[in-house]
């Protein structure tokens, strides 16, 4: 997965765009679609599975949509890292709750290192220590608040990177761009997957 991220990051943006738009099977979260890998080995079977996903989720095909704005280009380049970025953003936003209740120690090492690197401030918002699902949901909601600046077809596909429970995430204000860029840079330098127990 990490090697695939690096390869995708170097491709021209129109190629990345086409892959995201027409090959959701390459990134859809496994809890959203359970299909045996051997069933989609042949190109025709893979194409049919992608068509089913496009139809089932009523995904637009992105015709005539512009990929020139900087946020869209950032999303395209970092597409596969967005779940890790969301988790980091959730940790950052809830750092006061994590610190106060000793839950920092329960985070993966890479998330602890991210929080140690950036000493921002946050207010306590939880009565109890936030769990991994909640951290992912909060980060997802911060990223999702930026969807209005993305082409509709890309915004439609964004939730597919995450487990289904994410759609119940409460609305959040959009993440500050400086924190987003910091999380993206960190995820690019130290790629990791979101803990399985958060999904």
Curated annotation (Swiss-Prot):
Pfam families associated with the record: OrgA_MxiK
Residues in coiled coil: none
Residues spanning the membrane: none
Keyword annotations from UniProtKB, A to Z: Virulence
Biological function: Oxygen-regulated protein required for bacterial internalization.
Protein name: Oxygen-regulated invasion protein OrgA
Organism from which the protein derives: Salmonella typhimurium (strain SL1344)
Source organism phylogeny: Bacteria, Pseudomonadati, Pseudomonadota, Gammaproteobacteria, Enterobacterales
């Amino acid at each position: 997965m990490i090697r695939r991220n690096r390869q995708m990051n170097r491709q021209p943006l129109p190629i990345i765009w086409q892959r995201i738009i027409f090959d959701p099977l390459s990134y859809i979260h496994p809890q959203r679609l359970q299909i045996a890998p051997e069933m989609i080995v042949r190109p025709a079977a893979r194409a049919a599975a992608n068509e089913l996903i496009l139809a089932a989720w009523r995904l637009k095909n992105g015709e005539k949509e512009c990929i020139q704005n900087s946020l869209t280009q950032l999303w395209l380049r970092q597409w596969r890292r967005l779940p890790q970025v969301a988790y980091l953003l959730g940790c950052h936003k809830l750092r006061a709750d994590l610190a106060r209740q000793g839950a920092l120690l329960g985070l993966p090492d890479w998330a602890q290192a991210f929080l140690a690197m950036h000493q921002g401030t946050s207010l306590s918002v939880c009565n109890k220590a936030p769990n991994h699902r909640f951290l992912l949901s909060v980060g997802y909601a911060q990223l999702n608040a930026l969807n209005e600046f993305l082409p509709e077809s890309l915004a439609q596909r964004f939730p597919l990177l995450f487990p289904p429970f994410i759609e119940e995430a409460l609305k959040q204000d959009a993440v500050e761009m400086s924190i987003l860029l910091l999380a993206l840079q960190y995820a690019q330098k130290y790629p990791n997957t979101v803990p399985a127990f958060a999904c």
